[in-house]
Amino acid sequence: MLLKPATPLTILLLIAFVLLLLSVISTPIVKSIPLATFDNVEYGVFGYCKAGTCTAIHIGYTTEEIENTGSTDSDFNLPSDARRSLSSILIVHPIAAFLTLICLCLAAAAHLHAPSHSPRYLLALLILLLPTLLVSLLAFLVDILLFVPHLSWGGWIVLAATIILVTCGVVTCAMRRTLVSRKARKRRIAENAEMSGQNYYNRQNAAAAALNESKPIAPEAKETFVAATQSSESGPTFATFRTNTRSSDDDRTPLNNHSDPSAQDAGYQSRIPGDPVPYNAPRDDFGNPLPPGAYNSAPRMRTPGPPGPPPPDSRVRDQYSDPRRGPPTGFAPRGRGGYPPRGGYGRGGPYGGPYGPNSRAPLTGRGGYMGPMRGGPAGPMARGGYRPQPAAGGYGNARAMGEDEYGYRGPSSRQRTPGPMAAPAAPGPAGQAIEMMPQPRHEPDAQDEVPEQQQLHAISIDNQHEPVSPTSLYSRTQSYVPPRRNWGPQAYQSSEPNLPYQPNQPRHARSQSGSMYYEDEDPVYTSRNESAVGNSGVPSVLTPGNSAK
């Protein structure tokens, strides 16, 4: 148990009370505690004892009792009458003891929290100690006046109690002063925030709160567009955001926009997908198509004879064409050689079947010749950069095919070859091309005629027609034979499908088709072209008007 400020006060008050209590219980209550002794007589607060005989307990001395003690006025400092009057004041001893007892109880209660921190409580104790001290002091003075010069130790203990009460008063005053000072300091601290450090702590807390406080993120401003119409099937639309969608024209934008403007405007238009390109258009030294101005005036087919029907319109589709199939047969990519379109080969493999009469294989790029193909109509070209010629018994005229006719759906499996066509209502000469939209046709020049024997082919050492291209993966040899060497009128092979490949048979034999076959060219061109077979002494590159490179 820790000592508290009220503990010393309690101890002092206890001692003072004991001393005052001893003075109260003196003779005749306790014969061993006399206030004064003279001539074998012991004096106390409530009587005296003489030769062992004590008087009854009462307050004060009478004249008879004083005379019976045998004392005279010369024995004490006061006369007998004064002593008799003062003897009644001895009652202050029990009063002083009682007051001291009350102060002792209050000091003991000051150990509690509420009384010890109450200035008013300590003030009440201090006020009560003051009369206690005065009563104790009065008791000591009475003893001095009555019993001097025969005062005994019982009278002196009252003096000790009085001194202790004075000390208790000082301690009580100090306790209260300490408590009041503490409360006053707290009050001043409460009134002055800078003195108490409250402002400092407030600033620290505010700074910490500012650091810990998360700053709100400003929402990103977005441009909103309210939808004009909303369908009942869709949910509620709060905002619609603008998106950049690619139009269908983006797929038709040319990749190379730095080509010759004249060639783009008047000629080939940089091969924009969907533009019709003549099937047998002349090309320059590097395999690129010439502008229309360079070849529109020239005949499209360089074979002698009267002008034939005009070329078919690009909008007219082949009667057997399928939009789900790949690009037209032998339609090679533009450039100098390179790989063919994806889709595999025709029924006869990469070399296809025999040619029809007077059909030619126009070059689509630099490199070797694709060679004839076995089987029916030739499929897409092999990796070499050339497209094969239409096989014997092919269907429809050679015409310019637009890429939009096939929908860019990629090559599909080859469909069955259609059967013979019904005879037209007004049959014309054999070999007359069917024209849905007649167009004017220019008269071919005689200088463009090239003998069939002068047309050379690229033939390897084993008499097999192969493409010769730096990027081709299917070239066997690097042997070169002039391209139009075997284009003379020869007997065609039979049109029977799936015949085994016979390299020793003639390559350009005309097939004996039935009466329902319609040739792509007029017989006039065929007859005139056959007359020039024997002139094989002049190379094809030196023939005037020849555009094949």
UniProtKB/Swiss-Prot annotation:
Extracellular compartment residues: 31-88, 143
Cysteine pairs bridged by disulfides in the record: none
Residue span of region Disordered: 226-549
Biased composition (Pro residues): 304-313
Pfam entry (one): SUR7
Superkingdom of origin organism: Eukaryota
Family per similarity comment: Belongs to the palI/RIM9 family.
Protein name: pH-response regulator protein palI/RIM9
Taxonomic classification: Eukaryota, Fungi, Dikarya, Ascomycota, Pezizomycotina
